[in-house]
């Protein structure tokens, strides 16, 4: 029976995952258990360079059975009883490292705030902007079958609200962003090891090991001139120039080889920068800082976390309540900016067009998030089933690289809500969660990843921002083997400078996120808390992830489009329907300044821009 949200207010974590009583969490904070082992995004190493045994279903896979999770939902599945709907999020039991099972009905009740008799799925809350009323009218998202649209929004799902939005001030949770980067290991039978970025001097126990040979490039040139960002007047230009120079210098000191004083110099630069950003931008009159200064502040924090080498510390626990706030921020971002819906709907339209005539659909997703992208796809398949009494079955294989308990909790949460949503719509559905590390060695590639019959179509969702650049060739090698019908990629301008030194990448990130924050400010959000939530739970972690990945992989690598071409992939022109749908999406959005560009260069793509500044690009590829 769903538990009311009030029962959980004021607690450190949700009642059924209380860190004060659950020994499962203590394994992550126990220095004895953590000594000699650091978990990585893709794998982990130990002091002697060997591999430790996995203690979680999402730990590194070392056996021929690399499954994280596999579940199936069909029309006949039961979603309330222990056999059908009892999805589980994993918590760690301290003794054996195995996962305890926890029901999601409780969390769903917490998030929806509804009574036991009220059908309110949190997945509907997440996807209020992506799932639409089947009765709405729209000329897009049609693959020739007269299917209903997916982006028109007089939607009853918007009627649901988060019960915690108006919580009393004293009862609101205190949230902290806990970036948890890790290290890369060299799996069995992988290519030769790569030169390391050793981080702080004196860090001798933990080695950063990479699976590629050194191409012969120096990792950076700290004396390159940073690009400039113009302000509104001469004073703003002068202030911006100082901030850019300080960020560039701090990044250069972080990455200069040799010299034990470099971290000290970087720390001093960042301290002065933080002081200048705070003194020059007084928001005592409730005037928010300009986007440029906010972006600079977030980047300063990210560089400081790299300076502190927080990756060597035990991972900080992220309470399950953080998931609630991240979902709220995700929804606010989706409702405010066309960014997420543009990416999701354009990708889904391209995927649907590649699936016509197939009985089975297999999605390989490298960034499943909360699963929201697939809500409209599931709804479209349900619509086809209602029109023709038959529809393709859907399977999703999600590659994940969780590094904390909360990540695994989030994945299980996503899995359960996708299964429940598919069950409600009557779509035959399977989902499998796999550790991304298995792709580093073909020995561990499960047969379930390959096409099972000629009637099965495979599509890949590959956001470039979800990849560490050095691992992209290995991912493409795997994709070449499964021969997908289409690979849909989304990327941002800050994802394309892997051939530039790290300091230049920092300035490129500053430019990009300044534009993104400017676009969000143009929406004039009436809810200041929503604006703060978007930046705290969407923008700031994105900056941290971008710079952490760049810092971990210093070697310059070719542009990702060049790698696609070298691996045998060719670009595909996006359809007129996809373009029309994207145009309509922008027309519906109340925010002005966004526009669409269609590029027909070496790789045709649709580009979402704001004030002629590129925000995100979607392209399609085939092999």
Curated annotation (Swiss-Prot):
Region feature (Disordered): 62-90, 179-203
GO molecular function per UniProt: DNA-binding transcription factor activity
UniProt function note: Probable transcription factor involved in plant development.
GO cellular component: nucleus
GO biological process, one term: regulation of DNA-templated transcription
Cellular compartments annotated: Nucleus
Organism: Arabidopsis thaliana
Record-given protein name: Scarecrow-like protein 22
Annotated segments matching region Leucine repeat II (LRII): 413-448
Tissue localization of expression: Expressed in seedlings, roots, leaves and flowers.
Compositionally skewed regions (Low complexity) per UniProt: 63-80
Positions of the UniProt region annotated as PFYRE: 458-545
Domain GRAS per the UniProt entry, residue ranges: 235-622
Family statement: Belongs to the GRAS family.
Pfam family, one: GRAS
Top-level taxon of origin: Eukaryota
Chain residue ranges for the region called Leucine repeat I (LRI): 242-311
UniProt entry tagged with the keyword Oxidoreductase: no
PROSITE patterns in the cross-refs: GRAS
């Amino acid at each position: 029976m769903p538990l009311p949200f009030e029962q959980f207010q004021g607690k450190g974590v949700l009642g059924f995952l209380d860190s004060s009583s659950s020994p499962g969490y203590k394994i992550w904070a126990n220095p004895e258990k953590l000594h000699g082992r650091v978990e990585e995004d893709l794998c982990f190493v130990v002091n002697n360079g060997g591999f430790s045994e996995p203690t979680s279903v999402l730990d590194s896979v070392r056996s021929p059975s690399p499954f994280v999770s596999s579940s199936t939902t069909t029309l006949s599945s039961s979603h309330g009883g222990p056999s059908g709907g009892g999805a589980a999020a994993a918590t760690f039991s301290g003794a054996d490292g195995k996962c305890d099972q926890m029901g999601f009905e409780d969390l769903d009740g917490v998030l929806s705030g509804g009574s036991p008799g009220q059908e309110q799925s949190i997945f509907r809350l997440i996807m209020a902007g992506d799932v639409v009323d089947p009765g709405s009218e729209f000329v897009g998202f049609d693959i020739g079958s007269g299917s209903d649209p997916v982006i028109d929004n007089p939607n009853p799902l918007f009627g649901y609200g988060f019960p915690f939005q108006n919580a009393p001030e004293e009862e609101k949770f205190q949230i902290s962003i806990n970036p948890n980067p890790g290290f890369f290991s060299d799996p069995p039978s992988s290519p030769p090891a790569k030169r390391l970025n050793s981080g702080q001097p004196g860090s001798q126990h933990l080695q950063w090991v990479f699976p590629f040979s050194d191409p012969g490039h120096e990792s950076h040139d700290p004396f390159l001139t940073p690009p400039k960002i113009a302000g509104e007047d001469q004073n703003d230009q002068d202030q911006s120039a100082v901030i850019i120079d300080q960020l560039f210098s701090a990044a250069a000191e972080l990455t200069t080889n040799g010299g034990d004083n470099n971290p000290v110099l970087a720390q001093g630069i960042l301290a002065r920068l933080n002081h200048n950003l705070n003194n020059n931008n007084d928001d005592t009159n409730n005037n928010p800082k300009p986007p440029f200064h906010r972006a600079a502040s977030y980047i300063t924090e990210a560089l400081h976390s790299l300076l502190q080498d927080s990756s060597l510390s035990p991972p900080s626990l992220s309470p399950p309540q953080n998931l609630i706030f991240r979902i709220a921020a995700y929804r606010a971002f989706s409702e405010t900016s066309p960014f997420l819906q543009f990416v999701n709907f354009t990708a889904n339209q391209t995927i649907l067009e590649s699936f016509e005539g197939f009985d089975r659909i297999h999605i390989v997703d490298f960034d499943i998030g909360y699963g929201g992208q697939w809500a409209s796809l599931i709804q479209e398949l349900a619509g086809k089933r209602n029109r023709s009494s038959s529809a393709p079955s859907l399977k999703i294989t999600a590659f994940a690289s969780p590094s904390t308990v909360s990540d695994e909790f989030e994945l299980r949460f996503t899995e359960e809500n996708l299964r429940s949503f598919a069950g409600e719509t009557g779509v035959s559905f399977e989902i499998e969660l796999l550790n991304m590390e298995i792709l580093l060695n073909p020995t561990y590639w499960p047969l379930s990843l390959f096409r099972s019959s000629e009637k099965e179509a495979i599509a890949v969702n590959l956001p470039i921002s979800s990849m560490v650049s050095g691992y992209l060739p290995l991912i493409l090698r795997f994709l070449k083997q499964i021969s997908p019908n289409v690979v849909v990629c989304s990327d941002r301008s800050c994802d394309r400078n892997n051939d530039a030194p790290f300091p230049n990448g920092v300035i490129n990130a500053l430019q990009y996120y300044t534009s993104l924050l400017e676009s969000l400010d143009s929406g004039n959000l009436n809810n200041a808390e929503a604006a703060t939530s978007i930046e705290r739970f969407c923008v700031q972690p994105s900056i941290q992830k971008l710079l952490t990945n760049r810092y971990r992989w210093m070697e310059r690598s070719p542009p990702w489009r060049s790698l696609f071409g070298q691996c045998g992939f060719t670009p595909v022109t996006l359809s007129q329907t996809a373009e029309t749908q994207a145009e309509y999406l922008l027309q519906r959005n109340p925010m002005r300044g966004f526009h669409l560009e269609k590029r027909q260069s070496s790789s045709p793509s649709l580009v979402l821009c704001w004030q002629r500044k590129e925000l995100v690009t979607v392209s399609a590829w085939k092999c």
